[in-house]
Amino acid sequence: MATTNLSHYDKTIIPNAKDFRFGIVVSEWNSDITKNLQKGAIETLLDCGASQENIISWEVPGSFELVYGCKKMLETLQLDAIIAIGNVIQGETKHFDFVCNGVTQGIVDLNVKYSTPIIFCVLTDNSKQQSIDRSGGKFGNKGIE
């Protein structure tokens, strides 16, 4: 479990993103969390030289649908990378496990099948507070990382 703020980066060691096109697929579920992660990702891409018109964002209903959204992006757009953004919070049932396992394996499968990398930015936390802490709270914004 991440317990330090890793949301700081050194732009001098990151390639300039000026000539790259990025896709972002973001889950609408827990949108207070996912929108903060998306904001962090977009601000970081812009800070690293990407232009706003080269950042394409799509929304899907939940984290489980991130795989579908990423696959559609891969098949319809020419992109250099895709960021999958979601948030799953542990509840009282096994639903958490099924969603987390499904989206993780789905993103792995897409990374193996396609040559465009998909970055996994899905918070899988035990509580809403942990998600808040990692989407702009005391542990930074994992969308930046």
Role assignments for model-derived ranges:
Residues 29, 87-88, 123-127:
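Short, ordered loop/turn segments at secondary-structure junctions
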Residues 96-97, 101-145:
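C-terminal binding/interaction regions
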Residues 1-21, 138-142:
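N-terminal presequence-like segments and the immediate start of the first folded domain
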Residues 23, 56, 65, 80-82, ...:
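Structural motif
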Residues 65-107:
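Glycine-rich phosphate-binding loop
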Residues 13-18, 76, 110-114:
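Solvent-exposed alpha-helices and their adjacent loops that cap or buttress functional pockets
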Residues 12-60:
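Glycine-rich phosphate/diphosphate-binding loop of Rossmann-like nucleotide-binding domains
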Residues 40, 46-50, 54-77, 94, ...:
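Amphipathic alpha-helical hairpins
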